[in-house]
Amino acid sequence: MEQNSRALIDGFNRKIDYLRMSVTDRCDFRCVYCMAEDMQFLPRQQILSLEELFQVAERFVALGTRKIRLTGGEPLVRQGIVDLCGRIAALPGLRELCLTSNGSQLGRLAQPLFDAGVTRLNISLDSLDADRFKQLTRTGDLAQVIAGIDAARQAGFRRTKLNCVVLKGRNDHELVDLVRFAIERELDITFIEEMPLGVISEHERGESFCSSDEVRARLAEQFTLVESTESSMGPARYWRLAEAANTRVGFISPHSHNFCATCNRVRLTVEGRLLLCLGNEHSVDLKHVLRAHPGNPERLEKAIRDSLHLKPYRHHFEVGGDVQILRFMNMTGG
């Protein structure tokens, strides 16, 4: 079949069929694990246009990509995002168009996104305490985010997932409450080990690190966790709750249980660099290809294919010590 002959296969025989695209580096939050408080954002001419983003998505889908996730920054602060979603969702062969959001704009955009063809949402929620939420996000309004979560449910989204970055001494005492919140709303929830991207001064990452094993052990004191073989085509490993049929608990463990052996994804930064690995700087400048050869999908396809030999077998994140990756998560696509 043509699809198989055109599929993207890396040097370790991993099929690449999942693309994460950052549509903006801007965000209305300043989460302490994601960016510096005085973050300087890119000039608009340095980021990909909506048309350029669509051209990359179109080419990846033609090459066998079955899942695309739009990220940021906060993707919903990018003007024209709903129209972009509609165009990407309509690409023949794409099975899932997902979007990761901080939830702040979902009150007004959940229904338009659903109508445009977005299939699933991931929503960040690191605390259920309004003051602590404000401390962790620096600018966020918890009530507004919860209203956005509820708007997503009302719009018709199913299998919506909450994402929580666990920081020891900051929000790790809320784990059970967060799971109960997810159960009440029939949501999935994933607990994430903090990733060492960008130099931050707000906290020491080694001291705040909380492993997925520790999180799971604490949850097991309150819930019956049943390991699941289900997959979302991403890095999360899921467990079912015997007490709640409509909620799964996931763990993303870049430090304690890295997911590199089955990695099926690449990332496009807002500047148009195709990152072959979250934890390495190997990349190819697709913006240059798009602008040097406008309207030439063959040149874009060649650049994508040629990039695959740069994809390493694994990352080498470390809990403590110097930061290995200087770019912040909002530049990479969270």
From Swiss-Prot:
Keywords: 4Fe-4S, GTP-binding, Iron, Iron-sulfur, Lyase, Metal-binding, Molybdenum cofactor biosynthesis, Nucleotide-binding, S-adenosyl-L-methionine. [4Fe-4S] cluster 1 binds at C27, C31, C34. This is GTP 3',8-cyclase. It catalyses: GTP + AH2 + S-adenosyl-L-methionine = (8S)-3',8-cyclo-7,8-dihydroguanosine 5'-triphosphate + 5'-deoxyadenosine + L-methionine + A + H(+). Signal peptide: none annotated. S-adenosyl-L-methionine binds at Y33, G73, S124, M195. It holds the Pfam family Radical_SAM.
